[in-house]
């Protein structure tokens, strides 16, 4: 009698012991949880923190995480991008175990932290994959959640859209993978207290063959760069990208670069050249501590009636221990 009740409970929660596709203790093979181009329209802001103490360490022995972070954050460039409806996808087949919707999208501040206490995940979905495996999807856009409790989903099923509900400082999806109730790092398939990997490509982790080629580990990344007529601001950039394209009579022309996961000691260098003798440079002092997000810019104010027509070119570099670890170039052309 007790055995029958346990079986019924497992079936009710979606862990069907008679369904071999779900009832397996083998590691999951996860697809990308966001319908985006990884490294171009979305980026990994934070990995799982595998350090058991107050220090931080990601799976690749880097610092692209924060203390006690139990998931992976896939970020968009701005809330404006999230407003277009970037889909959140089931990473593997399973049964929806829980959902929440209706929490507003708003960036976290001192006031909102208390409003989301015990609901920091915001709008989200939990999927039971059987064999003790489950995935949780957080910070989804208010009103976007399509999944329902008990629903069977396939890998790639649309669950809703990326947002910034709950405790979120930027538009992103937080994905947590668990096995038997314990958080698992999807980049290694191991629990959070495992050793880091000096070669992040040595272990495919839980990702399937569609994700592995797209992922390139980076502890320091330039996620956006270009020309603008306004001095960039990090908070505004999270709202709408912070870009106001320059014109022939803009009061200033500025080249900027937005970066994530910089390390203490990094130096950010910008160089801009253009027609009419246009030239501007900037070099930061070595950063005193790690920076989850950072913005740098260089430019000039207009001192004549209009900017000279032609192509303006800017280059941004992150220099670490004397070597360039990432570099991007962008241009802006002003027609005659």
Label the predicted regions:
Residues 289-302:
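Aromatic sugar-binding surface patches on proteins
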Residues 26-55, 115-117, 146-151, 176-256, ...:
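Acidic, glycine-rich catalytic/binding loops that coordinate metals and/or anionic ligands
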């Amino acid at each position: 009698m007790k055995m029958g009740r346990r079986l019924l409970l497992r079936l009710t929660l979606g862990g069907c012991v008679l369904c071999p596709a779900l009832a397996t203790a083998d590691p999951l093979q996860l697809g990308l949880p966001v319908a985006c181009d990884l490294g171009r329209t979305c980026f990994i802001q934070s990995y799982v923190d595998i350090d058991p103490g107050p220090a931080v360490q990601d799976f690749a022995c880097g610092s692209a995480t924060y203390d006690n972070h139990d998931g992976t954050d896939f970020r968009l460039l701005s809330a404006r991008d999230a407003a277009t409806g970037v889909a959140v996808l089931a990473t593997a087949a399973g049964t929806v175990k829980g959902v929440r919707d209706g929490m507003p999208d708003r960036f976290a501040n001192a006031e909102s932290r208390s409003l989301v206490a015990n609901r920091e995940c915001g709008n989200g979905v939990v999927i039971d994959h059987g064999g003790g495996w489950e995935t949780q999807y957080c910070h989804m856009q208010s009103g976007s959640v399509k999944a329902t409790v008990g629903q069977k989903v396939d890998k790639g099923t649309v669950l809703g859209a990326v947002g910034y509900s709950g405790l979120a400082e930027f538009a992103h999806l937080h994905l947590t993978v668990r096995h038997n109730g314990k958080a698992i790092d999807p980049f290694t398939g191991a629990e959070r207290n495992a050793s880091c990997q000096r070669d992040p490509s040595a272990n495919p982790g839980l990702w399937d063959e569609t994700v592995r080629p797209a992922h390139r580990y980076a502890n320091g990344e330039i996620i956006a760069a270009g020309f603008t007529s306004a001095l960039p601001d990090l908070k505004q950039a999270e709202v709408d990208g912070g870009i106001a394209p320059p014109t022939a009579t803009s009061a200033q022309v500025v080249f900027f670069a937005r970066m994530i996961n910089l390390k203490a000691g990094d130096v950010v260098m910008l160089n801009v050249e253009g027609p009419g003798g246009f030239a501007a440079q900037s070099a930061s002092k070595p950063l005193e501590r790690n920076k989850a997000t950072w913005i740098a810019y260089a430019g000039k104010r207009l001192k004549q009636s209009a900017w000279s027509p032609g192509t303006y070119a800017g280059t941004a570099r992150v220099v670490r221990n004397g070597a360039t670890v990432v570099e991007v170039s962008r241009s802006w052309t002003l027609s005659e």
